[in-house]
């Protein structure tokens, strides 16, 4: 037997189109050389955002045994110690490629609001901060709405459809950090895990890569640049 995910969002196509419109606007904001064109009006900073909860801090119970030959295997004892978990809240600026992290022991409304405050401090006042994000309850909670109301006009949210997280480009980044850094990592504490994750972000931001969306872009061809 094979399983599938039933589409239970009656507005799936509409919401998907809204996300793709944003990606098309981003595409049109670059010239042929890949440079960002000047905005004619209010600048819109678009951030692809999501949370990655439950990142485990795991310690070895015995040292790894290093390979004895150039092509040998590293051996690791099958027992380990769980030291707790961290949640990664992260966004990618779709114009610059910069990755923006926040680590927390939870991923509640208060954590999401803290991330919004980081964005608010990062981008100049008067510019719009547009987030592509999923329908997590923290993104629509009373606490979050209260914060947004106190910063009217500063943030715009574009929600992915239910079961449509694959439309959010941050998911590709989460896959990358899992492959390159988190899979198999061993640490002595949660603090070390946090330090190493933040260091990963510092390293990749030295040469940021702009993510480009390709799927169905040929169907979104009549939009004007978001300038």
Please identify what each model-predicted range represents.
Residues 170-192, 205:
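Active-site proximal helix-loop segment of RNase H-like, two-metal nucleases, encompassing DDE(D)
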Residues 75-80, 149-169, 185-187:
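RNase H-like polynucleotidyl transferase catalytic core
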Residues 192-227:
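C-terminal domain-tail junction helix/linker
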Residues 48-50, 91, 97, 116, ...:
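Mobile genetic element proteins and their domesticated derivatives, centered on retroelements
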Residues 57, 67-127:
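Electropositive, glycine- and tryptophan-enriched low-complexity nucleic-acid-binding patches
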Residues 107-108, 131-142, 162-167:
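Acidic, metal-coordinating catalytic cores used for nucleic-acid/nucleotide bond scission
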Residues 52-55, 61, 94-96, 136-138, ...:
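Short, solvent-exposed loop/turn segments at secondary-structure junctions
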Residues 1-82, 224-227:
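Charge-mixed, compositionally biased segments that are often intrinsically disordered regulatory tracts
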């Amino acid at each position: 037997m094979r399983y599938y995910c039933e589409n239970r969002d009656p507005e799936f196509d509409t919401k998907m189109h809204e996300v793709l419109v944003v990606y098309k606007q981003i595409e049109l904001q670059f010239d042929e050389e890949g440079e960002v064109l000047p905005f004619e009006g209010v600048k819109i900073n678009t951030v692809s955002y999501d949370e990655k909860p439950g990142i485990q801090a795991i310690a070895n119970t015995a040292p790894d045994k290093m390979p004895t030959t150039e092509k040998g295997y590293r051996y690791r004892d099958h027992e380990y110690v769980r030291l707790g978990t961290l949640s990664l809240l992260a966004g990618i600026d779709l114009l610059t490629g910069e990755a923006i992290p926040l680590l927390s022991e939870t991923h509640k409304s208060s954590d999401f609001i803290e991330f919004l405050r980081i964005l608010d401090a990062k981008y100049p006042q008067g510019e719009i901060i547009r987030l592509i994000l999923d329908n997590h309850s923290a993104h629509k909670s009373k606490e979050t709405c209260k914060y947004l109301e106190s910063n009217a006009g500063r943030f715009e949210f574009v929600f992915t459809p239910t079961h449509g997280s694959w439309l959010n480009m941050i998911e590709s980044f989460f896959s990358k950090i899992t492959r390159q850094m988190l899979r198999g990592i061993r640490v002595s504490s949660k603090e070390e895990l946090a330090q190493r994750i933040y260091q990963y972000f510092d390293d990749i931001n030295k040469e940021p890569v702009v993510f480009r969306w390709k799927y169905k872009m040929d169907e979104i061809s009549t939009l004007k640049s978001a300038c």
